[in-house]
UniProtKB/Swiss-Prot annotation:
Swiss-Prot/TrEMBL keywords: ATP-binding, Ligase, Nucleotide-binding, One-carbon metabolism
Protein known as: Formate--tetrahydrofolate ligase
Molecular function in Gene Ontology: ATP binding; formate-tetrahydrofolate ligase activity
Catalytic activity field: (6S)-5,6,7,8-tetrahydrofolate + formate + ATP = (6R)-10-formyltetrahydrofolate + ADP + phosphate
The UniProt record lists the keyword Nucleus: no
Length: 554
């Protein structure tokens, strides 16, 4: 079989104006970015608002191996399968970060015959949204250190009188807004800035700082959650970047930088329209880090897609289930054990607890579940049939169906059965049931996620986390939602614990406030917001020929 990039480069694509026109978008709704991608003006929603909304299908996955189990492949393949059945359909996916593209995971355009194209443009820069977020984020960082420098250089009173601005009195030890870049670079996790020679302060005042990957920026989460340009502006203005000497929050609005940050992101609020290899429209927008934010593409892209064209598809793989048996050592950045790719009934049976946990977890929210068994070339029909039969055996107690997906090898033709079963699920009446309500305290919300969501015995907050929790409540942030930042390699907070653990403790070492995005996230265990490169990074495979053709991207 050809490589992903070879398949993509030999595909016949449709001009973007045709894709947009077939969707019902007007010429002035899009701004072409070359032949095969275009920005969709957010104002398109105004002439679409009276149209009925379509069905929203959420694709998630079991506890993954480091290479992922195929959420994007399944999303794209399912969209192509629905199109094969004559349905009006579009896909919505996140924009890939270049960090993982150059690291261990590679690109995020799907794979095989279920890809978004051109995949090299999607994986590398696209329309520059991530760079705009990086620039806006680091503008706030520069504003913080400039304000500290000038206020301390002149003194608070003189600074205020000279510039007709209030002295913010930022505590340099309480700056919570790190800098960002769109690469994996562990050496930048902790840095010292403002270093000078001979006791001078020309380079600013020295303090400890660090870098996160841009996908971990609160701005990325805000872009994904904002509903329009005004909402984006208001959310950016609420971002807390530091605390003053009295312990009170300093926002980007206080720094008077929120407007400039929004201006920098003005173009980024518009989703990018692309297509799958089979010409299915695909909206690509935002890319929040999934383990410290909600990890979905944008609400704006979803709203536009729903007007143009409420159920869960759970992706499982044989290797993913075997990996959750606990019989094989797994390590991020390392190759998967070869034993995961050969028939092993013992490992398959031992790993079923993890799939069962995820099925029940989806069912908690009141949604019907369709399990998509994502087929890999090395999978045997015997093991695939065994897994499908096992899922079917669980359907008597749960609203559940199953289909083997061959999206990778066959595109939309390989997901016809999955698409038919998803359509049946979409015809059902459902009522979404959240784990907690907005009026609950932050502690009760965190406890609900840990106990009701993960099946933990209890929470265990560090002294620092307890102090932060009390401060956030005192400052009036108790109404915010919560997010758990933990390893994706386990249901628990320990990546070495596989399967479906119970009665474990969820340790919270630190809480971080995202007032603009609208949530508080808890750092559980050793979660990194700036990834590092593996021993053999994916960038070693990338090259370009004299004709500009890229090779080695997957």
């Amino acid at each position: 079989m050809k490589s992903d990039i070879e398949i993509c480069q030999t595909a016949t694509l449709i001009r973007m104006k045709t894709i947009a026109s077939n969707l019902g978008l007007h010429d002035d709704d899009i701004t072409p970015q070359g032949r095969y991608k275009a920005k969709v003006n957010i104002d398109a929603l105004k002439h679409l608002e009276d149209k009925p909304s379509g069905k929203l299908i959420l694709v998630t996955a079991i506890t993954p191996t480091p290479l992922g189990e195929g959420k994007t492949v399944t999303t794209i393949g399912l969209a192509q399968g629905l199109a094969k059945l004559g349905e009006s359909v579009s896909a919505c996916i996140r924009q890939p970060s270049m960090g993982p593209v150059f690291g261990v995971k590679g690109g995020a355009a799907g794979g095989g015959y279920s890809q978004v194209a051109p995949m090299e443009e999607l994986n590398l820069h696209l329309t520059g949204d991530i760079h705009a977020i990086t620039a806006a984020h680091n503008l706030a960082s520069a504003a913080i250190d400039a304000r500290i420098y000038h206020e301390q250089r002149l003194g608070y009173n003189i600074f205020s009188e000279k510039n007709d601005l209030p002295a913010l009195r930022i505590d340099p030890t309480q700056v919570v807004w790190k800098r960002v870049m769109d690469h994996n670079d562990r050496a930048l996790r902790m840095v010292t800035i403002g270093k000078n020679e001979d006791n001078k302060t020309i380079n600013g005042y020295e303090r400890e700082d660090g870098f996160d990957i841009t996908a971990a920026s609160e701005l990325m989460a805000i872009l994904a959650l904002a509903t329009d340009l005004q909402d984006l502006r208001q959310r950016i203005g609420r971002i807390v970047v530091a605390y003053n000497l009295d312990g009170l929050p300093i926002t980007t609005e206080d720094l008077q930088v929120a407007g400039a940050m929004t201006v920098t992101m003005k173009f980024a609020i518009n989703p990018t329209l692309m297509q799958t290899l089979e010409g299915v429209p695909t909206f690509v927008h935002s890319g929040p880090f999934a383990n410290i934010a909600h990890g979905n593409s944008s609400i704006i892209a979803d709203n536009i897609a729903l007007k143009l064209t409420d159920y869960t598809v759970l992706v499982a793989t044989l290797r993913g289930i075997k990996a959750n048996s606990g019989l094989f050592p797994l390590s991020s950045g390392q190759s998967l054990p070869k034993a995961l790719f050969v028939p092993n009934q013992e490992a398959l049976i031992a790993g079923l607890d993890n799939l069962h946990w995820h099925i029940k977890n989806c069912a908690k929210y009141g949604l019907p579940v369709v399990v998509a068994i994502n087929r890999f070339p090395e999978d045997t029909q015997e093991e695939l049939d065994f897994l499908a039969d096992w899922v079917t055996s669980q359907s008597s107690e749960l609203n559940l169906d199953v289909a083997i997906s061959e999206a990778f090898g066959k595109g939309g033709e390989g997901t016809r059965e999955l698409a038919q079963k998803v359509l049946i699920a979409c015809a059902q009446e459902t009522e979404f049931t959240p784990l907690y309500t907005p009026d609950m305290s932050l502690l009760d919300k965190l406890t609900a996620v840990a106990i009701k969501g993960y099946g933990a015995e209890r929470l265990e907050l560090s002294e620092k986390a307890q102090q932060q929790l009390a401060m956030f409540e005192q400052l009036g942030y108790q109404h915010l939602s919560v997010c758990m930042a933990k390893t994706p390699a386990s249901i628990s907070t320990d990546g070495n614990i596989k399967g479906a653990p119970t009665d474990f403790i969820v340790p919270i070492r630190e809480l971080r406030l995202c007032a603009g995005a609208g949530f508080v996230y808890a750092l559980c265990g050793n979660v990194m917001t700036m990834p590092g490169l593996p021993e053999k990074p994916a960038f070693m495979n990338l090259d370009i020929d004299s004709n500009g053709n890229i090779t080695g991207l997957s």
